[in-house]
């Protein structure tokens, strides 16, 4: 790995740690933050571990039949492990942000929801194998999912997501990746 890439990765890691510390400190003063841990798999033997910091500004609109719409902001740092033998770079990091729109039940011990969002991502490496490249470090991440928020104080959340990551044909080739993910979240 070149010194330039190592320096770039070190800067990204420091930025992710600084963001995590800043959000962690803010969470000590508000009940609108959460920590999310997810795991997923994609085609071509790609596995993913994802750490997310979630901010809920408390916005609600369109109350319909005991449900309402809301939006949360998610900040992600993820690690990809490529198990394919021909992997050019078996370890890839992904950093990004996504606004997530939810349609969630208004009240109850268990509050089911559906969600969708489109965000941006930056990858540390774009070449997955010699014949498959993401072409650009800048990617879009769109996802849809289902889940539930639960607990006496709504501190817990679990869900399943389908996530597609690609560069939207900014540059070709653009094979994209489709992840199936499960996640758990603790809300402060």
Give names to the regions the model predicted:
Residues 27-31, 58-69, 104-112, 152-155:
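Short loop/turn motifs that connect adjacent beta-strands in outer-membrane beta-barrel proteins
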Residues 80-116:
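Helix-adjacent hinge/juxtasegments
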Residues 54-58, 100-104, 147-149, 185-187:
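Transmembrane beta-barrel domains of outer membrane proteins
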């Amino acid at each position: 790995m070149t010194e330039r890439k190592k320096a770039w990765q070190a800067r990204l890691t420091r930025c992710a740690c600084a963001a995590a510390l800043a959000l962690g400190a803010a969470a000590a003063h508000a009940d609108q933050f959460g920590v999310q841990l997810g795991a997923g798999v994609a085609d071509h033997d790609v596995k993913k571990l994802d750490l997310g910091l979630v901010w809920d500004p408390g916005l609600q609109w369109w109350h319909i039949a005991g449900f309402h719409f809301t939006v949360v902001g998610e900040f992600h740092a993820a690690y990809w492990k490529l198990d394919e033998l021909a992997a050019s770079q078996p370890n890839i990091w992904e950093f990004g942000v996504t606004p997530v729109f939810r349609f969630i039940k208004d009240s109850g011990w268990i509050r089911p929801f559906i969600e969708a969002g489109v965000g941006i991502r930056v990858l540390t490496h774009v070449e997955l194998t010699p014949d498959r490249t993401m072409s650009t470090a800048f990617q879009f991440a769109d996802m849809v999912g289902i889940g539930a928020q639960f607990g006496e104080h709504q501190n817990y959340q679990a869900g399943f997501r389908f996530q597609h990551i690609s560069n939207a044909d900014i540059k070709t080739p653009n094979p994209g990746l489709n992840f199936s993910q499960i996640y758990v979240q603790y809300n402060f």
